Amino acid sequence: MRATRRRLGLVARNVGIPILSLVLVLVLWQLIVVGFHVASYVAPRPRAAIDAVTQNWSVLWPLVLGTIRETVYGFVVGAALGFFLGVIMAKVSFLQGLVYPVLVLSQAIPIIALAAPLVLILGFSTAPKIVIVAWIVFFPVTVNVIDGLSHVDRDLVNLAKVYGASRWRTFWQIEIPATSTPLFSGLKIGATYAVTGAIIGELAASDGSSLALYQEHANSNLNTAAVYGTTMVMTAIGISWFLLVVGVEVFATPWRRRTVARRWPWRRGRDLADR
């Protein structure tokens, strides 16, 4: 019974803290708009932005699904590419010295500048959006995998060799678990920017209907409430995707659940897993 109450209390704290933060942001928004007499065409009240979303949800929902689809596909492609490229570069030092500068150079290209040639090559379709998201995601994953594999405890690796473990078994049972912390750090960084990449892709390569173009249309019509409401929807997608990655980290690394719980994005203080 006591354990059940502790679990319920843990869930309540993990859910209640972010909800409280959201409420505080909305209250601050309301106070600024009302207190400084901000014109509605500059910044609407939170209720107006929320109403703009709920009243047009039948139109927004298909667009939201499209953005989520682009984010998921691009994230999966970028994460897989980043993981395998990171492993190869960590294992072959010559490739690391050869390819690493190219990777850094690739990230120096502004995403907006990258979008135009992608549209010329792939056309106005979902493909350029997926490529842009993957482009954003793969770099932090690659860098963190290289860093993780470069700092594996060599004593454990040598001990595995002494006991006759194959390279493949050593890789999966020692090196990959040891790399889980930097790997998921890279995935969480990628998750944070994945939705941004999808929105940029929609602005540059949309074939007529997308969440980004819906916001642009609202902006051109001076529908400020819809502009802010769409921004809230985009933010909700990004936060949800980040939390999903955190949840996967918790379940995929059972040996680190206590640490992951302690590093919960908005949690500070005592170890949640011990409460």
Regions found by a protein language model. Name each.
Residues 4-7, 11, 35-77, 220:
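Periplasmic/extracellular loop-to-transmembrane helix junction in inner-membrane transport proteins
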Residues 104-140, 147-148:
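Generic hydrophobic transmembrane alpha-helix motif, especially the helices
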Residues 31-34, 87, 94-101, 144, ...:
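Membrane-spanning helices that line or support transport/gating and their immediate boundary helices
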